Amino acid sequence: MGQKVNPHGFRLGITTDHVSHWFADSTKSGQRYKDFVREDIRIRQLMSTGMERAGIAKVEIERTRDRVRVDIHTARPGIVIGRRGAEADRIRGELEKLTGKQVQLNILEVKNPEMEAQLVAQGVAEQLTSRVAFRRAMKKAMQSAQRAGAKGIRIACSGRLGGAEMSRSEFYREGRVPLHTLRANIDYGFYEAKTTFGRIGVKVWIYKGDVTAKELAAQAASAPSRGPRSDRGGRPGGADRGDRRRRNDRPAADAAPAAEAPAVEAAPAAAEGGQA
């Protein structure tokens, strides 16, 4: 299972989080769930078109009623911002035209790009496009990631490697990459290299270490909760279980004198029979 499924989706809610944060329950056109999903796809396509040199690792989207917040995680924030913020203003204008809402654009710098799987995959793909030998590109990327502190890395390339007539897949691995361990913090990235022989897919898995119980507790504490639950003891009738139990005991106590009453009345009758 861990060998096939996407590592991000497999660990969703454990070590990874959603990249889109919004809720849709409307039936109006343009505000339905499928409309928001389609809009998110277009936003990410807009970020990837013409921004290859910026090194965008991830795009996070958060929606409110009248605003859309877009967080761009990039290794080269200067390219995204542009001179005097001209490029950022252009991107914000296109996003507002696409969504029809006010857009808050945040550009965040990636501190360690050698540890970001998406950026590593993009770097290998760019080297393949430049006709660098695929084995050399893969080994160079693995060495850089290990020097940056990765505990394990795996890179796979699929396609017409080296211009061969028949396509094949090759991968290299250094260190540990436990894909089936849910507590393992594994980053995954995919990118396609467009070469003269066709497209070559590049997949990268980077193992950054296990998530400790302390970090899991911190994530659980920061997660939104459903709020305080209502007191189960409170009943609509105004009485809890203890009161109901005591209320049920009262008829039994009241029934005891009623049961003794016929015996008291029968005593004089028996006495009259003895006199007769």
Swiss-Prot record:
SUPFAM superfamilies: Prokaryotic type KH domain (KH-domain type II), Ribosomal protein S3 C-terminal domain. Residues 228-243 have a biased composition (Basic and acidic residues). Keywords: Ribonucleoprotein, Ribosomal protein, RNA-binding, rRNA-binding. One of its GO terms (biological process) is translation. Residues 218-227, 253-276 have a biased composition (Low complexity). GO terms for molecular function: mRNA binding; rRNA binding; structural constituent of ribosome. Gene3D superfamilies: 3.30.300.20, Ribosomal protein S3, C-terminal domain. This is Small ribosomal subunit protein uS3. It comes from Pseudarthrobacter chlorophenolicus (strain ATCC 700700 / DSM 12829 / CIP 107037 / JCM 12360 / KCTC 9906 / NCIMB 13794 / A6).
